[in-house]
């Protein structure tokens, strides 16, 4: 099933690129939470939703672009969790750092994850405790790697005082910034060692990257030390968290 989901992510990426490569300035609307949504978000959502319903008609889908009501999903034990276009701000700026995120959740845990960056043509995916990166037709298994000083990856679009204070107290380190769930993937492939997050994220932002990072040997915990949990709840917001190899 993993290969079929990877192909769905590629198909969604193709739909996104049709909008991305257009000559017109990027048009977008604002959702209720003031986050932007574009025609590419909707096109990718449609591709993934139709594909998953064909592939696994018995598994419900929770997508950022059409989340079911709480009453519908409150008892879900197994479901797909999808962000058709993670990093819409990056997409609007045409800076390449946006992804398609697809995760399978079982009993609150992401057991399969696919992250595809369509401009970069890089795919990360994980299942059954193993993680891979595929680029230019070459697939390799990935795992975390220690480095001193550690490289800390942070959000390109979200910074806050808590993060600034945390980094000041961290000790010797280097930083890099990148958009979307690629931050999880940098830790998973050994390019970075830590991704701290204090600002708001939603479950669809993190689930696929979470699966990949853990399969590669990283830990994904909130600031109280608890693993991020995807058991259905009324709010889609995550607590603050960190992805770390330590």
Swiss-Prot record:
The residue ranges crossing the membrane are none
Residues that bind Mg(2+) 2: 83, 86, 205
Q: Which Pfam families match?
A: Inositol_P
Q: Where is the signal peptide?
A: none
Give the bilayer topology: Peripheral membrane protein
Per the annotation, which location comes first and is thus the protein's main one?
Answer: membrane
* Top-rank EC class of the record's enzyme: hydrolase
Where does it localize? Cell inner membrane
Cellular component GO terms, alphabetically? plasma membrane
- Which CDD domains does the annotation name? CysQ
Q: Which InterPro entries match?
A: CysQ (IPR006240), CysQ/Inositol_MonoPase (IPR050725), Inositol_monoP_metal-BS (IPR020583), Inositol_monophosphatase-like (IPR000760), Inositol_monophosphatase_CS (IPR020550)
Q: What are the names of the required cofactors?
A: Mg(2+)
Which positions bind substrate? 64, 85-88, 205
EC no. given is 3.1.3.7
Q: Does the keyword Phosphoprotein apply?
A: no
Q: Which reaction does it catalyse?
A: adenosine 3',5'-bisphosphate + H2O = AMP + phosphate
Instruction: Name one process (GO BP) from the record.
Output: 3'-phosphoadenosine 5'-phosphosulfate metabolic process
Alphabetic keyword roster: Cell inner membrane, Cell membrane, Hydrolase, Magnesium, Membrane, Metal-binding
Q: Example GO molecular function term?
A: magnesium ion binding
Q: Does the keyword Hydrolase apply?
A: yes
Ligand binding (Mg(2+) 1): 64, 83, 85
Summarize the protein's role: Converts adenosine-3',5'-bisphosphate (PAP) to AMP.
Q: Which family does it belong to?
A: Belongs to the inositol monophosphatase superfamily. CysQ family.
Q: What is this protein called?
A: 3'(2'),5'-bisphosphate nucleotidase CysQ
